[in-house]
């Protein structure tokens, strides 16, 4: 089972800072030593054979908000915690190891391979033991229904991402009762990311079922765990072992997700209410590293923190105003203001598709994210926003240049500090920023996902395949923003992303993604800040869990040491 394997949208409110490398001063008052970034395959999970684990016990997590959509392929299902939960109870056909290499999951697949390249044909043999919790076997019909819902041919299905699925021409029964045969109309290199997780056909085969059927709970499951209880009053979601599971029996009795404000997670961990907490902020790290019975586990994850600019409304519809905002924000200053007390130096991230520890990374930011407040002023002058003097917002047509920075009420102090820094920097060039706090449970559903903001900051995580980022940068279609919440895109970017997804030549794909990245910077889509490594405080006796880096977590193998 995975913990966030699709691209997840995780609010920067959950922690805007990253700590990595070796231990800091551990609270001794000395300045921490700056360390190099972790290796691409870096992970720390306290690995043990299952025989070392005792039977029983619970694993408890904090989540940011109550889940209101469990169909993560639907536009409202993009909250990271929802993806964590649903990928733990639905079939994940492929798993990623510590180096990011993809392997078929034998619990669901006997085999999966490309059997023809012209046209591209992929054939799966499903595990005959694999069944949904309603007793029906997994079959080619599940694949067909998911393809029809996600291929973009019927816009009534509010799909968050059609890439890959729209390149499939046919889904049919393959060899034998458990075979699936998928034919592509054009090559698609990342075919393993499709149908992962897999949803049951009879619960997503109409727009009504697809869009609304999963809005309150996971209707059907097929994994080592199932949802045992949704407790809206206690704000908890409890997973329990599924007795019908055909694979290795889980060691844990339950996995409990509890809604906790991000700022309260450290206290909840110290009070032994949860078993993991992010040790990302200096004030949290100093407390957690000294907590009894605690390991600090570190990993190198695909995890970026950025600021999204909404080009779909207001002053930011003008690309020159977006460039002015970028030029007015000192990324080094924002990052350094947080990293000064950390053991890891937060260097500016200059690529939207690749992390610095990945093959393919190059700096494509050009002049578009260089700190230059004088340039910002000139851009605003040229855009018709007149300077009204120091400390006053610029005006145009009698209107003040004012932007909202939307922030969750559950934000950490660092997220609030970041918003205030941006407010000060933009104020210095004549842009008034109002920090707008909204209820944590509404942050994504009513604001981010709907484009109801001017400026927000959150994270994109676990983009093991670059095609997973397609919905972040493709042009919206009508009211469907996909994951391009700021509505900034172009036909040229769409074309480059389509070409990149369609080539099976890895070097060519890397080249095309970097070409698309150049165009994304030119449009002022977003302001990249930094890559965020994993730093987690975890109970010392917990095995096969912690900071998994690029790898996936198999919850059937997670448990407490004897």
Tell where the protein language model's regions lie, with residue ranges:
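Structural transition elements
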Residues: 329, 347-389, 409-415
